[in-house]
Amino acid sequence: MLGECHAHLMMNAVDYQRAVADNARAPREDLVRGFLEEYRRLGISFLRDGGDRLGASRLAKELAPEYGIDYRSPIFAIHKAGHYGRVVGFPFETMGEYRDLVARAKAQGADFIKIMLSGILDFDRYGVITSAGLPVEEAR
């Protein structure tokens, strides 16, 4: 079995701005099916997606069985307002808002919860993270 363990299917791996524009109104089923068909053609039968805020990951999860793909997704990521994560999910400010987002992910069929604990690596500056991490007391 071949698997992809950190995908963001919505991002298309080519042009992020175009990917967002393509899915802005609603996830494009033709594009999602095209990606799933390519994974199948390559012999990939397991895909762990990181989610997105536009719904492409949710649609892919629904369609993947047609392609023989075991597709796991958080549907979307959860991040602290003002911190890294807007690209792939929704923000929270209070623990009540966090709980609401967890319930929303569960209701939409999430296989796991993805919470952004830190920024990402700054590829222009060695060893630098793009934003401060979530405070330890909130991460618990």
Name every feature range the model reports, one short phrase each.
Residues 29-58, 68-79, 110-124:
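Divalent metal-dependent hydrolysis catalytic cores, especially in the metallo-beta-lactamase
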Residues 28-38, 91-105:
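Short, acidic/polar
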Residues 18-20, 80-87, 121-126:
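A short acidic, helix-capping loop that chelates divalent metal ions and anchors anionic groups
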Residues 2-62, 84:
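Metal-associated gating/positioning segment near the N- to mid-region
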Residues 96-117, 121-140:
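Histidine/acidic residue-rich metal-binding segments in metalloenzymes
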Residues 61-77, 129-140:
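Alpha-helix-loop-beta-strand connector modules within alpha/beta enzyme cores
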Residues 3, 71-81, 86, 94, ...:
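Acidic, metal/ion-coordinating pockets
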Residues 23-24, 87-93:
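The substrate-binding groove and active-site-proximal loops of carbohydrate-active enzymes
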